[in-house]
Design a protein with these regions (language model features):
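Short alpha-helical linear motifs
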Residues: 39-43, 78-79, 140-141
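Transmembrane beta-barrel outer-membrane domains
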Residues: 31-35, 77-80, 92-98, 144, ...
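Extended alpha-helical regions
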Residues: 39-41, 83-136
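Outer-membrane beta-barrel and related beta-rich outer-membrane complex signature
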Residues: 29, 51-88, 121, 125-136, ...
C-alpha cells in the first residue's frame, strides 16, 4: 500500500505512507520468513523559505529456521543429501526489528544560503537462536561433523543531531 498526497487544500502540508508485508516459504526444510514494514513522512511549508519534515519507519524480518549448513565428505565429495535438507532444528529463528524516527527543519536564507537542523533516533533489536554443523564427514567411519547451537540478543540505539549552514562565499 502506498498513499501519497496533500494533507491540506493549499498543498502546504503533504504526506506519504507505505506499508508492505512479505512472506516467503522455502524448499529448504524448516525455512520461511515474514517481513512487515512501514514508512511515513510529512512535509510542511511554514512559509516560502521554511520546510519542516518529520517521519518514521519500522521494519521487521522474522526468519524461521536457521540457515542450512551441510557438511561434505573429508575428500570434498558431496554427501548426496536431498536438496531440501536442513540439519538445523525447526525451533531455530533469526528475528530483527528496526524503528527509525527523523525530523528536519530547512530554511533558505538570503544570498543562496541554507540552514538545516536534522535529528534522527533509531532502535534495532536482534534475537537469534541458531544451530549449525561444521567439519567434514569421514567417508569410511561417517564420523566428523560437530553440532553447535547458540543464542544472540542485541539492542542498538542511536541518536543523531546535525546542524548545518551552507552557502557560497569568497575566501580570497
Amino acid at each position: 500500500v502506498d498513499i501519497t498526497g496533500p494533507l491540506t487544500s493549499d498543498g502546504h502540508v503533504r504526506g506519504r505512507a507505505i506499508a508492505v508485508y512479505q512472506t516467503n516459504d522455502s524448499f529448504i526444510d524448516y525455512r520461511s520468513s515474514r517481513k512487515p514494514s512501514a514508512y511515513a513522512i510529512i512535509e510542511a511549508d511554514l512559509g516560502p523559505n521554511t520546510l519542516v519534515t518529520v517521519g518514521g519507519s519500522y521494519a521487521e524480518v522474522n526468519n524461521d529456521g536457521a540457515l542450512p549448513s551441510l557438511p561434505r565428505y573429508s575428500d570434498g565429495s558431496d554427501l548426496k543429501l536431498p536438496r531440501h535438507t536442513n540439519l538445523s532444528n525447526p525451533w531455530a529463528y533469526d528475528n530483527t526489528r528496526a524503528w527509525e524516527f527523523f525530523g528536519q527543519v530547512e530554511h533558505h536564507l538570503a544570498n543562496g544560503w541554507t540552514f538545516k537542523i536534522n535529528a534522527m533516533h533509531s532502535d534495532k533489536e536482534l534475537d537469534r537462536i541458531f544451530n549449525y554443523t561444521s567439519g567434514a564427514v569421514n567417508p569410511d567411519t561417517l564420523v566428523g561433523p560437530r553440532y553447535a547451537a547458540g543464542r544472540v540478543q542485541t539492542t542498538n540505539k542511536q541518536n543523531v543531531f546535525d546542524v548545518n549552514l551552507g552557502g557560497a562565499f569568497e575566501l580570497f
